[in-house]
A protein has these predicted regions:
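Extracytosolic ligand-binding ectodomains
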Residues: 2-459
Length: 459
């Protein structure tokens, strides 16, 4: 039997704390230099980051992604590499920003790099991200990590581009990627690719989606269509709901399930059988007792990219319109990675993508031991990208090449970190090697292991 997600998290102990130093550290894969670590005393706190002004915008960007244009080479430097961290270190998101900074500091400590210096800058405030980028670049930053929010990325990007310095943002909004900007967050596209590919490998043919009527929902539908075009099958149904609909989705799910047409077809079948007097027809009519509809919905896999209370409000309503989740496979997103998902019977047997839970658990243990707190979900992005920077300082670039050139950042073998393997693609999006989890009551388990290299097939 495959181990459950919860058992992975419980297995981290004193022994794995030591293993963390070798396993969770990011290393360039397949032929590039690995990083070997030993446990050391936790470093002294670093000086407080320089602040800019208060109030970072958080609304997502809406512009289409631009193709990544290689920078002319970036700054050529010797000695210690300076890497900026653009984070909201004051204001409403200060706790998140501090957690991201903690994760980056932890990565620097574990890497034992003496060739890397972090330059934290506060993005809070009107124009804060642009001011933070300018401040860091004036201090000699050769690479920018962050910001978190898409609008802040848009503000910082032109400043960095003018200096030929690449940006690896912590956003998951692919619309800000391109022209020297990378998106290292967990994009819906990457998540949907993984779960659709897995569903296809298990026989799913016809896909449907039940999504919020929002830009996120639109992006999810586009990602589903693209994934199905890549891996095969067809998208047969799409239904949208507003954010206030989740407690009663009756009209939306009724239409999604073709419930009225299937009820009408059942009625016709019953009437036809009732008009006959032979024993076979009588037996067939009796078998229809308790049946609500004729046939199945026009899909065998249903994507529901929600989580938390919304997911738990939506799922029980499926059976009201005869969507039998024993015959229709439910598919989810990272938002399903919640212990309460396991308590909803309608989601039993559903699949969702996730980073490898064992390496994630090791990162969380390391963070907890160091900072006496649990890291937020996206803190591992700051951890992994800081380790990426540390790894690239371990080897010298080619003559005339920047340490953080586009070519070095986008090496096809990729990197491995707390969230498994990832690589920065030429379109500015991070591709990730994800696992697939199957939901079961108090015992969800991995059914599709995460790949360990990018030439390894997944199923």
């Amino acid at each position: 039997m495959m181990p459950s997600i919860s058992s992975f998290l419980r297995r981290v102990d004193a022994v794995s704390w030591r293993l963390l130093l070798a396993v969770s550290v990011l290393a360039v894969l397949a032929g590039c230099q690995n990083v070997n670590l030993v446990q050391r005393k936790v470093p002294e706190p670093r000086p407080a980051p320089q602040a800019t002004a208060p109030g970072e915008p958080q609304t997502p960007a809406t512009e289409a992604p631009a193709p990544l244009t290689p920078l002319p080479g970036g700054p050529i430097s010797t000695g210690k590499a300076r890497v900026a961290l653009l984070l909201p270190l004051s204001g409403a998101n200060a706790a998140l920003g501090q957690s991201m900074l903690n994760a980056a500091e932890l990565a620097l400590f574990l890497s034992e790099s003496d060739k890397l210096e972090l330059l934290p800058r506060d993005t809070e405030g009107p124009g804060g991200a642009a001011a933070a980028a300018s401040s860091a670049l004036d201090a000699g930053a050769e690479l920018i990590l962050g910001p978190i929010f898409a609008n802040a990325v848009q503000d910082a990007a032109p400043i960095a581009r003018a200096r030929n310095v690449p940006v690896i943002s912590f956003s998951n909004d692919g619309t800000v990627a391109g022209n020297g900007v990378f998106v290292a967050g967990f994009t819906p596209e990457n998540q949907i690719d993984r779960v659709v590919a897995f569903a296809r490998s298990r026989g799913a043919q016809k896909f449907a989606a039940l999504v919020p009527d929002s830009p996120y929902g639109t992006r999810t539908i586009e990602a589903l269509r693209q994934s199905v075009a890549t891996f095969g099958g067809s998208v047969t149904r799409v239904a949208r709901y507003t954010s206030t609909d989740t407690q009663d989705l009756s009209p939306v799910i009724r239409q999604l399930a073709d419930y009225d047409a299937r009820r009408a077809a059942l009625r016709v079948n019953r009437e036809a059988l009732a008009a006959k007097n032979d024993e076979a027809s009588k037996a067939a009519l009796k078998r229809l007792d308790g049946v609500e509809t004729a046939g199945d919905p026009q899909f065998d896999a249903l994507l529901i990219p929600e989580g938390g209370s919304r997911l738990r409000a939506i799922a029980p309503q499926l059976s009201l319109f005869d969507i039998d989740t024993r015959r229709v496979r439910t598919l989810g997103s990272f938002d399903w990675n919640d212990p309460l998902t396991e308590t909803e019977p309608a989601l039993n047997g559903g699949w969702y993508p996730t980073p490898p839970p064992d390496s994630r658990a090791q990162f969380e243990t390391s963070y907890q031991k160091t900072f006496n707190a649990s890291p937020p979900r996206i803190a591992s992005i700051a951890f992994d990208t800081t380790l990426l920077a540390a790894v690239l300082t371990r080897t010298d670039p080619d003559p005339g090449q920047a340490r953080f050139s586009i070519e070095r950042l986008t090496q096809p073998n990729g990197f491995a970190g707390a969230d498994g393997i990832f690589r920065l693609k030429s379109n500015g999006i991070a591709e990730r090697g994800l696992a697939v989890v199957e939901v079961h009551l108090r015992a969800s388990r991995i059914v599709g292991p995460a790949p360990t290299t990018f030439d390894q097939p997944t199923n």
